[in-house]
């Protein structure tokens, strides 16, 4: 791949196993000249074990219209909602609290996300998770 020139990098968030040519995937990939169905099939095959999880994906498009993609961990807010069984965060986070995260849950989420975060210490990742939780109206132990 060293002789291929990168022409575009596309960042999307797609539910696992549910990629289809409809917006936002189709227009983003179509504008770059990528085979949309080829991407959808590859992505769905790679994410069949994580159905419904919102997954950030970075798609690299090369000059010969081929592509490669890298999946990242779900966003922290999605992991918090999943851990607490929430549909969404609070509309007024400083007044209305929608749940409470335990220290153990924070540690698990931080460990999952650490490879995507620019942190070295687990404690730093935990503080980032706590900040996201507070901004969603979730109490932190």
From Swiss-Prot:
Alphabetical GO biological process terms: translation
Highest taxon listed in the record's lineage: Bacteria
UniProt xrefs under CDD domains: Ribosomal_L11
InterPro entries: Ribosomal_uL11, Ribosomal_uL11_bac-typ, Ribosomal_uL11_C, Ribosomal_uL11_C_sf, Ribosomal_uL11_CS, Ribosomal_uL11_N, Ribosomal_uL11_N_sf
Pfam families xref list: Ribosomal_L11, Ribosomal_L11_N
SMART domains: RL11
Keyword set, alphabetical order: Methylation, Ribonucleoprotein, Ribosomal protein, RNA-binding, rRNA-binding
Post-translational modification: One or more lysine residues are methylated.
Cellular component terms (Gene Ontology): cytosolic large ribosomal subunit
GO MF entry, a single one: large ribosomal subunit rRNA binding
SUPFAM superfamilies reported in the protein's UniProt record: Ribosomal L11/L12e N-terminal domain, Ribosomal protein L11, C-terminal domain
Keyword set includes Membrane: no
NCBIfam families: L11_bact (TIGR01632)
Main function: Forms part of the ribosomal stalk which helps the ribosome interact with GTP-bound translation factors.
PANTHER family assigned: 60S RIBOSOMAL PROTEIN L12 (PTHR11661), LARGE RIBOSOMAL SUBUNIT PROTEIN UL11M (PTHR11661:SF1)
Subunit-level organization: Part of the ribosomal stalk of the 50S ribosomal subunit. Interacts with L10 and the large rRNA to form the base of the stalk. L10 forms an elongated spine to which L12 dimers bind in a sequential fashion forming a multimeric L10(L12)X complex.
Family recorded in the similarity comment: Belongs to the universal ribosomal protein uL11 family.
Name this protein carries in UniProt: Large ribosomal subunit protein uL11
GN (gene name): rplK
């Amino acid at each position: 791949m060293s002789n291929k020139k990168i022409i575009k990098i596309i960042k999307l968030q797609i539910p696992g196993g549910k990629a289809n040519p409809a917006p936002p995937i189709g227009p983003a990939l179509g504008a770059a000249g990528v085979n949309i169905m080829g991407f959808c099939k590859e992505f769905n095959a790679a994410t069949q074990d994580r159905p419904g999880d919102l997954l950030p994906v970075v798609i690299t498009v090369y000059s010969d219209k081929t592509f490669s993609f890298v999946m990242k961990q779900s966003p922290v807010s999605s992991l918090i909602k999943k851990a607490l069984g929430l549909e969404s965060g609070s509309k007024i986070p400083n007044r209305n609290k929608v749940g409470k995260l335990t220290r153990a849950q924070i540690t698990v989420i931080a460990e999952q996300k650490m490879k995507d975060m620019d942190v070295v210490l687990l404690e730093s990742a935990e503080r980032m998770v706590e900040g996201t939780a507070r901004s969603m109206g979730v109490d932190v132990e």
